Amino acid sequence: MKKLFASLALAAVVAPVWAATQTVTLSVPGMTCSACPITVKKAISEVEGVSKVDVTFETRQAVVTFDDAKTSVQKLTKATADAGYPSSVKQ
């Protein structure tokens, strides 16, 4: 029983290391009004694997945190393009 508990405790500590979370900043130059970020955020949020989205109109950027085992940057940029706001990775 002690070995089982120790194994579970170790797994709980090590599991976050295996998580494949990434953060990317997308440039979304087509946002032309203060309502545009709402549409962009909704489109990105609907992509499976996205855990956080911050969209800023002033800088025309979207900072996206996602699980790269479930989605990719290409899927994120496709989601914004499909919503009418083409985007690219900000270098």
Curated annotation (Swiss-Prot):
Query: What is one cellular component GO term in this UniProt entry?
Result: periplasmic space
The reply to whether Cell membrane figures as a keyword in the UniProt entry is no
- The record places domain HMA at 22-88
Annotated GO molecular function terms are: mercury ion binding; mercury ion transmembrane transporter activity
Question: Where primarily located?
Answer: periplasm
Protein residues bound to Hg(2+): C33, C36
* Signal sequence segment: 1-19
Deletion phenotype, per the entry, is: Merp-merT deletion mutant is unable to transport mercury into the cytoplasm and shows almost complete loss of the resistance phenotype.
Return the similarity comment. Belongs to the MerP family.
Check the record and name the PANTHER family matching this protein: P-TYPE CATION-TRANSPORTING ATPASE (PTHR46594:SF4)
Name of the protein this chain belongs to:
Mercuric transport protein periplasmic component
* Gene, per the UniProt record: merP
